[in-house]
Amino acid sequence: MALKHYKNSDSTVFNDAKALFDLNKNILLKGPTGSGKTKLAETLSEVVDTPMHQVNCSVDLDTESLLGFKTIKTNAEGQQEIVFLDGPVIKAMKEGHILYIDEINMAKPETLPVLNGVLDYRRQITNPYTGEVIKAVPGFNVIAAINEGYVGTLPMNEALKNRFVVIHVDYIDGDILKNVIKEQSLLQDDKQIEQIIKFNEDLRTMSKQGQISEEAASIRALLDLCDLITVMPVERAIKRTIIDKLEDEREQQAIYNAVELNF
């Protein structure tokens, strides 16, 4: 199935990402949750025809999750031997692929310094488990994504941040958003789509004012909502896709108020 490409009314977002990629710069995509950062990375991967290896960061991320680990394997002679299975970082370096580090500021600060040599001019790393020195082959690039201010995130270490060039990725809107809804959801009714876009604009405003979380206004939640509207009333669809995900009753009530104003 063909990849649904990233779209944005600001063409400089993708064009600059492509230019930085061509210059072999580390790219840091910075923006609210659900704004399309991963979709942008996937689109870039397809456009340059280079596979992408993804790391999903969390507080549980460790060096083995990045680099790989030792395991026991039975060889052709039936004997057991210890082998090292490459992780996403080493795979991407050896194969000249893209390394995508999602939500990089969710990782514990002490986990990431192992990547310093990967991210600077050296483009190499010494595998602490095997002693092998791996130097990235041509084609290797690094893209990372960050959700600033999101629950559970930590400020990025300045030494790490300085290894990236930043591109801000904001939510899409207007005709671009309308086209994305038609292409990526089941909802095709123009009048309903216009209502949903207006509702989403209200959610984004509330999110910027701190009344609700960013996830409630995300494109992911919006597309889920559009799908559900085709099989149930809009109010119930909003409850299933947005309201019931929220723990704070004040956030829930703020969205109920927005529903009353828009539908």
Swiss-Prot record:
Stored InterPro entries: ATPase_dyneun-rel_AAA, CbbQ/NirQ/NorQ/GpvN, CbbQ_C, ClpA/B, P-loop_NTPase
Organism domain of life: Bacteria
Binding site for ATP: 31-38
Alphabetical list of Pfam families matching this protein: AAA_5, CbbQ_C
MF-aspect GO terms: ATP binding; ATP hydrolysis activity
Ligase recorded as keyword: no
This protein's UniProt keywords: ATP-binding, Nucleotide-binding
Family: Belongs to the CbbQ/NirQ/NorQ/GpvN family.
Protein name: Uncharacterized protein SAB1265c
